[in-house]
Amino acid sequence: MTFKNLFHPDKVYLLDVLHGLTNLPPQYANVIIFDPPYNIGKDFGNNFDNLDFTDYLEWADKWIKQGIRVLNDSGTMYIYGFSEILAHIFVRINLPKRWLVWHYTNKNSPKNFFWQRSHESIIAVWKDTDKRIFNLDAVREPYTDVFLKNAAGKERAATPGRFSHGNKKTIYTAHENGALPRDVIKVSALAGGAGRVERFFYCDTCENIFMLENRGDHKEHKIIEHPTQKPTELTKKLLLASKPSEGGKVVVPFAGTGSELYIAKKLGMEAIGFEINEDYYCMSNLLIQKGFPNGKI
């Protein structure tokens, strides 16, 4: 059976990550987003979030190896995780890479009387720096008020060094599309009020998805909630940074809610995902087909 007959875009397949990836051809994907279990004991309906740490790293090596094979030379692979876990994975990847930080301030654990976690990390991996796609203007950020007030348009004194322009005076300029993107991405987590717009659930009884505001309509039903749904704003930024000018292919090996595939589809990209949890498999495909129930995303 050929690849074209095996997989069709904009769909999640009920397959293990390794089984799915090994059936994709080399150089297939422009973007791969890995959002694996972090090995911290969360309930994903399987045991892959509670492995011996050595076993976890060896398992990660396998799907990362397949991800590298599937990634094309101009593509980027993103891997989510907590810093203390990703640090071990980072040093095992022998390719160009960059450490990104997803910073949020709206999530805490009141019972944890210690340093509150306010970030997760993302490793960006690519094969060839000369060929890698990075759409700078698509991910520029707003300038700070301080820069716009005190520096933009003003004269910069001549100083020795690599930015001295021949030891001449220059002008601070503000790019019309915003500042250069930073490696700290500030996006609210889907907690509290920030989660109301896009956190959604799967009703196994109704075989449909619904938003948080409609949870009261399903009181006696079997409700499935994914514990690590990522914000669509964050996903959109990663995809916009790395997508080709036209089309492009995305692979999401741990599909979860399917939100990454949904955003990829909205951006005109073809997306394929894999998921071994049957509830999440149903949940993700419904999202891709129907979109968010509130129609706001």
Model-found features: residue ranges?
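Core catalytic lobe of class I
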Residues: 1-273, 277-283
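Cysteine-dependent PTP/DSP-like catalytic domain, specifically the C-terminal lobe
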Residues: 279-297
